[in-house]
């Protein structure tokens, strides 16, 4: 009651946020006459002035915001013929403040993004606009690029298939558009490279995520994985697959469709053991066979052809469950993809080993500032707040929404439902009203298509099998009499304009734009052909604009676009997205969902409550029921699924957070090693755990730093080895064992006498003694190898080469070990232990051991290094680049099925710190004034890995 009164008096949080931004809109309106008076050439000049003020004179972006927004509004009019509405200015301010702007379909999100993009580009640190597919990235970069170029800013686009040089150029632009996976994979690929100069991505400063719910929530259940071929044989997949058909459901195994898992019964285990000639499937040596059996059962009984995947040209291609699009290049992990290939009788590809992985949550949380926009985020506001620490602000529409949403209609069987919805589509088509039919899978879209064909209703189908003309089909879905069947949210990001999209129709009529001279064609002839194409396009556009305007009026009179949902999705948000395709910009529209008790959502999550409601309403075969109670019960089922999926994502994040700390530590070390002598600043971020504030550090590492770092590694190894052989009780000291370990690690013979005095001092003396001997060996090796023509000790270059080799090999093995730990950790729950805590603890111990192996390998190999002939710096560089090419050729980038993790927050504004003083030597006094040596004071806390 108290909260209700407060809301009445103070307004909701959303209302207060909108009220706070109203003065900005008024200020931009005041500046509009001044901007209108500018000449075209004044726009880039003003932007350049603001850039200088922000970078050199300390002017903040918030100070510049009113002027910048007013400039962009006028630039939109001149470059695009589009003026930002007041509500779009509010949306731009929300994005700039690092929040999510919920804006309904057709409200111009693409144009809204130009406001914070231009403003944040003034910092010179880059702006990334993240889209759901390559088509939208290209379209938006080209379309909005006209506005950016008008303001003197450069635009790049990141899509599949670009070379590293092209990617570097795109990321070097003021504003970079790109597909979400490409950004994540570029980050992982960069951290597998062997020269800092080859990195493409640069700083993660500010990201605006378009369709933010799709990217940060729907796709967050599956991490990005870069993998390479492993030595596993595919023979076992085929052998197991051959015996799976003999397994009987509910007798030999049970299926939990909700969690997509399968559990074998005792009878099933016994049957499998006989069929595979195995004594005990649960014996340690047969765990791999058991895993293959479980994955084969899932492939046969959970993963369905034309729903979860399609088989195309002898290849199993995953279907995106949220968009219905095919995802070529992506493979399920953990042997599941191979099991599906065996089931479908296609070639079984070799299983891959993970080389690098990151979740979307942890990738996007690395940005200094993160914002997003979508038509449907409010239902997931809690998850955005908990996982990303981002608020959702609902932006009012420019014109009132007049769409009519009918209550759900429910039938007993799927057949009755399809029959009824096809009758409705036929009737609407008869009047000329356009209809968009939303389905949840490829198979269901083809069922509806077949039924409409039988009735003689012309229609277009848009699913994973027919996606080539996606944008064109969706853009024309608003034409008179059009019937379009679409899986889920295919075509999202393309507006459905009543009467048709004149621009798309003109391009289709005229044909593609000439992009290169034909064979033997002179440049002048090519330019003339291009000019002729532009002229014909303009003529077609003029003609079609008049035609579509007249058709628009007719369609409006018929009631606008009618949406027919064939099934409720497991998320309310996806249903809202489908409904949101109708009623854009104040246009009329309507929507209705046809459901049946056989639908997946009702069957798995609907429980007996909905069945009971139907019984009480006295439902008969072929009869439909509409009731608000029923709609509420279905919404309750959806909330259950949303909560279940949130738990999965939270789980993924909690596990990935463990890996995230380790990944960042290893990548930081790797960048430092690459930085030795590179002359390129290495940028790192230090986060205050309390305030979440990030401080930006720039540091240039010299070849001298490399030598110091190697001695730090020697000291770490010596302290560890002495500590292991010399515990607190002198009686337990194993000096012979210490001698053997030193011989094995450093290749030097040392004899030790029993200690005299206190154990702690004796241990320190031993450490000093061993360190001095190894340091002499190291200096001798440096002298022995001499210097290259540039005056750099040859040992330095070999240190870098061997260090990178050790890091990459050990990290790859560590990822495999962590995978195995993750797969088996759930069993700890049976021993009354928390699996997550156990994973954190053991994962940390494994990481410490891995870093020890890296140090041991580097120093051991360095001290044993014998050069048959002196290699030049160029030869070493060539060897390093060959290593990089070989590694990158063998990798596969994919989404993998996984489980995962928790609370994440984007960082506040960063500060830059550039080191002004020289690097402090290991044995120099610590600058803090403690009187201790640097290596024993602050040097200990700053030591890498």
From Swiss-Prot:
Matching Pfam families: P-loop_SecA, SEC-C, SecA_DEAD, SecA_PP_bind, SecA_SW
- Region Disordered: start and end of each range? 892-945
Q: What class of enzyme is it?
A: translocase
Cofactor(s) listed: Zn(2+)
Print the keywords alphabetically. Answer: ATP-binding, Cell inner membrane, Cell membrane, Cytoplasm, Membrane, Metal-binding, Nucleotide-binding, Protein transport, Translocase, Translocation, Transport, Zinc
Instruction: Provide the binding site for ATP.
Output: 88, 106-110, 495
Tell where it localizes. Cell inner membrane; Cytoplasm
**Which EC number applies?**
7.4.2.8
Q: Name one GO cellular component term.
A: cytosol
Do you know which SMART domains this protein is assigned to? SecA_DEAD, SecA_PP_bind
Q: Which InterPro entries match?
A: Helicase_ATP-bd, Helicase_C-like, P-loop_NTPase, SEC_C_motif, SecA, SecA_CS, SecA_DEAD, SecA_motor_DEAD
Q: Give the main localization category.
A: membrane
The protein's GO terms of the molecular function aspect are: ATP binding; metal ion binding; protein-exporting ATPase activity
SUPFAM superfamilies found in the cross-reference section: Helical scaffold and wing domains of SecA (SSF81886), P-loop containing nucleoside triphosphate hydrolases (SSF52540), Pre-protein crosslinking domain of SecA (SSF81767)
Please list the GO biological process terms of this entry.
intracellular protein transmembrane transport; protein import; protein targeting; protein transport by the Sec complex
- Catalyzed reactions per annotation: ATP + H2O + cellular proteinSide 1 = ADP + phosphate + cellular proteinSide 2
| Topological relation to the membrane, as annotated | Peripheral membrane protein
Does the entry annotate any disulfide bonds, and if so which pairs?
none
Sorted alphabetically, which PROSITE patterns does this protein's record hold? SECA, SECA_MOTOR_DEAD
Ligand binding (Zn(2+)): 926, 928, 937-938
Compositional bias annotation for Basic and acidic residues: 902-914
This protein's assembly is summarised as: Monomer and homodimer. Part of the essential Sec protein translocation apparatus which comprises SecA, SecYEG and auxiliary proteins SecDF-YajC and YidC.
**What family is this?**
Belongs to the SecA family.
What is the protein name stated in its UniProt record? Protein translocase subunit SecA
Gene name of this polypeptide:
secA
